[in-house]
Amino acid sequence: MLTFMEHILYSFYDASGWHRDNLYALLTHSSQNLIDFRVPEGVAMNVSALSTPNSASSYTLTNLGHIQGSVAYLSTSLSLPRPHSGTLDLHTVVPGYHKLDPINSQDRIYDTIWQGGKPIHRQDSLLFGRLALPTNTLEAMYVRRFNPTTQLLVTCVSGAHLKSGGALTLYWQKDCRQYAHELLYSTNEALLGARGLYNFGVDMSKPHIASRLSVGGEFYYGVLNKSPGMSTALRYVTQSAYTGSPLTMTLTCNPIMGEFSSTYSLRTGPSSSFSTRYDFNMYSYLSNLSMGAEVWKSRDSVFKLSSSLQDKTARVLWGGRYKDILVNTGVAFDYGGRVPDVTAIGVEFQYAC
């Protein structure tokens, strides 16, 4: 389940017209949501509020054998709708199968303001900060839109227990809908990187066409440790010829590590989705088959289940709403031994107004 601040961030992206479907890092978004979903640990309570249309605050208290907490603030130049945990659509905070938005050349008109017959691009921004206690770890994020296709994202973390005291990462992102690319730099090992994605079979004048083939890749290099890395991937999105249900297939490859991963995700019905993933290493010949599914019992209740056969791990999660409070509870365990070993168990409560 997304946190309140994550929901506000995605609302900012939607309001500013930024589409995340073309980000290479989110190419396997659907399978990750259905297989690698996060299970809460301990007991956590989060209280958040959008005090004004342009600012929000959030307070979290967690018990993991010892008390931890965090205080977060967010400010944006855009006026955002006020979410209330009692009326919020649960589908927006519980990620599952993600159906890609159609590519339309006219979907960025509202990003431009016309003055004197000349276009003036809106340069909206978002600033976020969070302080974790008692570790005194500070996290910050800055998002700045320069024009309808370009965005700067800056993230940083600072703490005495971190290597070099923290790290700063910059992402220069450009999304032209037909293709997208981003450049990144991180002070951690002086990392330099580039990512790109191109969509084939796209007709801007016919956004209703469901099929789409996306091909992308990334390359990065750590200057200090002289360590390169790269990966390539493709994603095919279409609809089932028999049921009309949307489905997504992906194939990713890391040639340096010899790792291949293929996924197949399908929305099996109005309230259910299913995903499988097969991982294979060409050097060690090790493989793993993972499966995950979600079922919505109602608009206010969802069950998730995933398992990996080689790792012999399983996860069970329930997300729902009790009155005006969002509840997220689950358990993860390892069934490889004679007695199943619980690796994570917890419950989260969220209230937002």
Swiss-Prot record:
Component of the ER-mitochondria encounter structure (ERMES) or MDM complex, composed of MMM1, MDM10, MDM12 and MDM34. Associates with the mitochondrial outer membrane sorting assembly machinery SAM(core) complex. Component of the ERMES/MDM complex, which serves as a molecular tether to connect the endoplasmic reticulum and mitochondria. Components of this complex are involved in the control of mitochondrial shape and protein biogenesis and may function in phospholipid exchange. MDM10 is involved in the late assembly steps of the general translocase of the mitochondrial outer membrane (TOM complex). Functions in the TOM40-specific route of the assembly of outer membrane beta-barrel proteins, including the association of TOM40 with the receptor TOM22 and small TOM proteins. The keyword Hydrolase does not apply. One of its GO terms (cellular component) is SAM complex. It is a multi-pass membrane protein. GO terms for biological process: establishment of mitochondrion localization; mitochondrial genome maintenance; mitochondrial outer membrane translocase complex assembly; mitochondrion-endoplasmic reticulum membrane tethering; phospholipid transport; protein insertion into mitochondrial outer membrane. Lacks alpha-helical transmembrane segments, suggesting that it resides in the membrane via beta-sheet conformations similar to those predicted for other outer membrane proteins and porin. PANTHER family: MITOCHONDRIAL DISTRIBUTION AND MORPHOLOGY PROTEIN 10. This is Mitochondrial distribution and morphology protein 10. Belongs to the MDM10 family. It is found in: Mitochondrion outer membrane. The keyword Mitochondrion applies. Keywords: Membrane, Mitochondrion, Mitochondrion outer membrane, Transmembrane, Transmembrane beta strand.
